Swiss-Prot record:
GO terms for biological process: 'de novo' IMP biosynthetic process. The gene is purT. PROSITE patterns: ATP_GRASP. Pathway: Purine metabolism; IMP biosynthesis via de novo pathway; N(2)-formyl-N(1)-(5-phospho-D-ribosyl)glycinamide from N(1)-(5-phospho-D-ribosyl)glycinamide (formate route): step 1/1. Its EC number is 6.3.1.21. Mg(2+) binds at residues 267, 279. InterPro entries: ATP-grasp, ATP-grasp_carboxylate-amine, ATP_grasp_subdomain_1, PreATP-grasp_dom_sf, PurT, PurT/PurK_preATP-grasp, PurT_C, Rudment_hybrid_motif. This is Formate-dependent phosphoribosylglycinamide formyltransferase. Involved in the de novo purine biosynthesis. Catalyzes the transfer of formate to 5-phospho-ribosyl-glycinamide (GAR), producing 5-phospho-ribosyl-N-formylglycinamide (FGAR). Formate is provided by PurU via hydrolysis of 10-formyl-tetrahydrofolate. Pfam families: ATP-grasp (PF02222), PurT_C (PF21244), RS_preATP-grasp-like (PF22660).
């Protein structure tokens, strides 16, 4: 039976978040609701989750020694990775020393880069995926593209939010695509994956929870991508019963192979009744922010319940709902927001992440809406997001 100690007291139950962005912030809030002591860690100061944590630290999370020292200092009961760019080999070592890594260290190691999870899905589990090759030199990259054929997609094996990702339609784009991929990796330049283009009707995120009371699924989430990053997401995404069943079967296989308790964001391509595995993250997913308004328990609440070893019970979905990102472009270290009075009309909500600065384009918030149908929910969310005016000195 779980015992939770009181935060800031000797018997506190401590949760260390490795990654303190907007997703980590919502996880921190859910931890706070249960009286857990929250320690937020990121590579920069004043990250969103740090605003709602009991303590925070700024370290290079790719530095295994620094990570080990911080864990020894804070003595967390749960280590919760919220990003890919972490010294996962150190997480494996820490787990062997008795630390509880969420969902487990092997899951974070395999999913920190696209190669580990692709080989697990395609080669070990024999799941349907796109054709693919890996390369770590320009010559190997050029050959891999020739093997896959045009059009194809190149991505750093370790990146997020579309960084370093590009669509290659002809040979003239090869050099630029290689150089862009080398700039976009979370751990610097290095290995890339080249994927054949999959013809699909739509993409979904199937939030899949592995918990003490079994495997649970949220309703499928549809989303629109632009420049490799999501712009709107909605729930539920309409799909055939056969496709949904196949999606659940694939997702269950993947999360069972990864192991541990927690929420996983499984990305899938759907074409008619056929489902193709794309990627998985062993943590809440950005497209899943729609669950802040669409369900009785958000993806963040579900993640916390699962990793604490608590039962999930019943997940209720309230009907057509959507999220739309607030994505301004400016340079400022003193960001201000206006227009909330206009944005908050009808069944809408706004989340402003509290990021300390912006240099170029950056996701600073999200608008959420519920409506009678998906199309209306998306339009209402987009309109609400567009009504937020962002400025800075």
């Amino acid at each position: 039976m779980l015992t939770i100690g009181t935060a800031l007291r000797p018997g506190a139950t401590r949760v260390m978040l490795l990654g303190a962005g907007e997703l980590g912030k919502e996880v921190a809030i859910e931890c706070q609701r249960l009286g857990l002591e929250v320690i937020a860690v990121d590579r920069y100061a004043d990250a969103p989750a740090m605003h709602v944590a009991h303590r925070s630290h700024v370290i290079n999370m790719l530095d295994g020694a620094a990570l080990k020292q911080l864990v020894a200092q804070e003595k967390p009961h749960y280590i919760v990775p919220e990003i890919e760019a972490i010294a996962t080999d150190m997480l494996v070592e820490l787990e062997k020393m008795g630390q509880h890594v969420v969902p487990c260290a092997e899951a974070t190691r395999l999913t920190m880069n696209r190669e580990g999870i692709r080989r697990l899905a395609a080669e070990t589990l024999q799941l349907p995926t796109s054709s693919y090759r890996f390369a770590d030199t320009d010559s190997a990259f050029f050959q891999a593209v020739r093997d896959i054929g045009y059009p194809c997609i190149v991505k750093p094996v370790m990146s997020s939010s579309g960084k370093g990702q590009s669509l290659i339609r002809s040979e003239e784009h090869l050099q630029a695509a290689w150089e862009y991929a080398q700039q976009g990796g979370r751990a610097g330049s290095g290995r890339v994956i080249i994927e054949g283009l999959v013809h699909f009707d739509f993409e979904i995120t199937l939030l899949t929870i592995r918990a003490v009371d079994g495997i649970h699924f949220c309703a499928p989430i549809g989303h629109r991508q632009e420049d490799g990053d999501y712009r709107e997401s909605w729930q539920p995404q309409a799909m055939s019963d056969i496709a949904l069943q196949r999606a659940k079967e694939i997702s269950a296989q993947v999360v069972t192979a990864l192991g541990g308790f927690g929420l996983f964001g499984v990305e899938l391509f759907v074409c008619g009744d056929d489902v193709i595995f794309s990627e998985v993250s062993p943590r809440p997913h950005d497209t899943g922010m729609v669950t802040l308004i669409s369900q009785n328990m958000s993806e963040f609440a579900l993640h916390v319940r699962a990793f604490l070893g608590l039962p999930i019970g019943t997940i209720r979905q309230y009907g057509a709902a959507a999220s739309a990102v607030i994505l301004p472009e400016l340079t400022s270290q003193n960001i201000t927001y206006r227009g909330l009075e206009t944005a908050l009309i009808g069944d809408t909500q706004i989340r402003l992440f509290g990021k300390p600065e912006i240099a170029g384009q950056r996701r600073l918030g999200v608008a959420l809406a519920v409506a009678d149908n998906i199309e209306t929910a998306i339009e209402v969310a987009k309109k609400a997001a567009g009504n937020i005016e962002v400025s800075g000195e």
